């Protein structure tokens, strides 16, 4: 939503302002199996899973791997980016 869009804009602006000394990137996770979704109703969870092209909830380890990539030298030419890890849910019409 709005907060993710604000973070994405901030990342782009900061990356341009402080490069090449520091790389700035972010991760935008989708529905992830955490304590936070335990309070979600079963119906809402089912609907969100159904609206996700990969038809499942993500695992915290999957987000950790995305972050690990951004911290590694493998992403040394990546800056100003937001890696969306949401099972294909965003953007959907």
Which sequence ranges carry the predicted segments?
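Active-site helix of classical SDR
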Residues: 3, 11
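Alpha-helical segment proximal to the catalytic Tyr-Lys
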Residues: 12-20, 76
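Short, flexible catalytic-loop segment of classical short-chain dehydrogenase/reductase
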Residues: 25-39
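A short C-terminal helix-loop "cap" of Rossmann-like NAD(P)-dependent dehydrogenase/epimerase domains
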Residues: 38-52
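A conserved structural motif in NAD(P)-dependent oxidoreductases
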Residues: 52-63
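Alpha-helical substrate-binding/gating segment
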Residues: 64-76
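Short C-terminal tail/terminal secondary-structure segment
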Residues: 68, 79-93
